[in-house]
From Swiss-Prot:
Protein name in the entry: UDP-N-acetylmuramoylalanine--D-glutamate ligase
One GO-annotated biological process of the protein: cell wall organization
Function: Cell wall formation. Catalyzes the addition of glutamate to the nucleotide precursor UDP-N-acetylmuramoyl-L-alanine (UMA).
Cellular compartment(s): Cytoplasm
Length: 471
């Protein structure tokens, strides 16, 4: 745990008692603060009280006693409308912040020789894979590495800092909205496509949240920016004009005079005086697909930005074990392979997996994002058949009508059974792909639970009396 500095003998209100809120409360107390916790769920309040926390009804509280409101990132800050705790805090002149901001202030308050290196990663898609990959590169190069934020442990739950440590942090747009003091040594912005627009009031608000990650960078820091979409290209152009830091563009499809890029799966380093061919990403078994070329370029650049050697960075790419729920093979029965890409919670993320296979039996659906699957129409000819689940099943069937055969499966378990039956009947080598292009909250607690349900459904299938074998 990282004890939070700057709130000694002050009281901080904490709203939202999930993993982030409880971890922040513990870290605040460890740093000498007092806390007043609240959640709208009685079970969460009871669990906090059982742990010994002061549970205070923030609706009835005197807000003048609070030095700050620590808001969990899932709670609306501004859109569709500010949460009532935010309105009360603002009315009382109480600042609203998140756990990443508490971490940033604690780092900034530490003596220079005790401050760790910080690599911060954001983007619409690929954040978790890239964060885990950077963590692996740093750790395999011998650095004392801690990985967290929007992946794994909340940032304040990581081991306490020292000058030789490297913190690799995945940051969502929600977290960035609540952060103003973070100064990363290296920032990675992978890509931007429409997502979470209801929480940011539209595309401009979403982009503004992502841009906050660069807010405090200056001389000696590095900005690593994907330039394969127009929004990130514009950000790269604007930040380059500011000329305050080192900027390395990254691309998964075009050669550049400066930066790191991949062409046909080969990684090139153009950060020095000449372009160097450094790795064949196609040899990295846990980085399949063109989208992972960008992830590899970003991770390599981030590792190099904090002084890891070219060879150590390349070695790390080749030994990366991969992440669950990201194009993860969970089993094979006969000629049918089952791929879990449950992390694909929007159409752009699903595109990455769908583009990797010439033909597949597609399981999709859940809570659709803006635009649904309209942007995937160019990939519909690859769909052998679609099996639709959750709230989006019927709308998705309308989009697919006349373009790809589909069935309303309803549940994930039924979809797996139907997809396996059809794939096995084809007699060919086949892929059953769970890449939902949707959030999971209509039927599951999160994408991980959805992915585990897919794994369980696959394991529940039999072929000649045997369970699915992990390929």
């Amino acid at each position: 745990m990282i004890p939070v500095r700057g709130f000694e003998d002050k009281t901080v209100a904490v709203f939202g008692l999930g993993r982030t809120g409880l971890t922040a409360a513990r870290a605040l107390i460890a740093g000498g603060a007092k806390v007043a916790l609240w959640d709208e769920k009685p079970a969460s309040r009871e669990a906090a009280a059982a742990e010994g926390f002061a549970v205070v009804d923030l609706q009835a509280a005197d807000w003048s006693q609070f030095a700050a409101l620590m808001l969990s990132p899932g709670v609306p800050l501004s859109h569709p409308k500010p949460h009532w705790t935010v309105e009360k805090a603002r009315a009382a002149g109480v600042e609203v912040l998140g756990d990443v901001e508490l971490f940033a202030r604690t780092v900034n308050a530490a003596p220079a020789h005790k401050r760790p290196k910080i690599i911060a990663i954001t983007g619409t898609n690929g954040k978790s894979t890239t964060t885990a990959l950077i963590g692996h590169l740093c750790a395999s190069a011998g650095r004392d590495t801690r990985v967290g934020g929007n992946i794994g442990l909340g940032v304040l739950g990581l081991e306490d800092m020292h000058g030789g440590a490297v913190y690799v942090l995945e940051l969502s747009s929600y977290q960035l909205d609540l952060t103003s003091s973070l100064k990363p040594d290296a920032v990675v912005l992978l890509n931007i496509s429409p997502d979470h627009l209801d929480r940011h009031g539209g595309m401009d608000g979403y982009i503004a949240a992502k841009r906050r990650i660069f807010l405090n960078q200056g001389k000696g820091d590095t900005a690593i920016i994907g330039v394969d979409d127009a929004w990130c290209q514009q950000i790269c152009t604007e930040i380059t004009a500011a000329n305050r830091r080192t900027i390395w563009p990254i691309s998964a499809g075009k050669a550049m005079g400066r930066g790191v890029y991949a062409l046909q799966g080969v990684l090139y380093d153009a950060t020095g005086e000449r372009v160097v061919e450094v790795a064949d990403i196609l040899r990295a078994r846990s980085l399949p697909g063109r989208h992972n070329w960008q992830n590899a370029a970003a991770a390599y650049a981030a590792a190099r930005a904090i002084g890891i050697s070219m060879q150590d960075a390349v070695d790390g790419l080749m030994t990366f074990p991969g992440l669950a729920h990201r194009m993860e093979t969970v089993g094979k029965i006969g000629k049918v392979r089952f791929v879990n890409d449950s992390k694909a919670t929007n159409a752009d993320a699903a595109r990455q997996a769908m583009s990797s296979y010439p033909k597949f039996y597609w399981i999709a659906g859940g809570v659709a994002k803006a635009g649904g699957i309209d942007d995937l129409k160019d990939l519909f000819p690859r769909i052998a058949k679609a099996y639709l689940i959750g709230e989006a099943a019927e709308p998705f069937s309308w989009t697919l009508a006349g373009k790809a055969e589909c069935v309303l499966s309803g549940t994930l378990e039924k979809a797996v059974q139907q997809a396996y039956a059809d794939a096995a009947a084809s007699g060919e080598e086949a892929i059953v792909l769970l890449s939902p292009a949707c959030a999971s909250f209509d039927q599951f607690s999160d994408f991980e639970a959805r992915g585990e349900a897919f794994r369980a459904a696959v394991n529940g299938l039999t072929a000649g009396g045997g369970k699915a074998a992990v390929a």
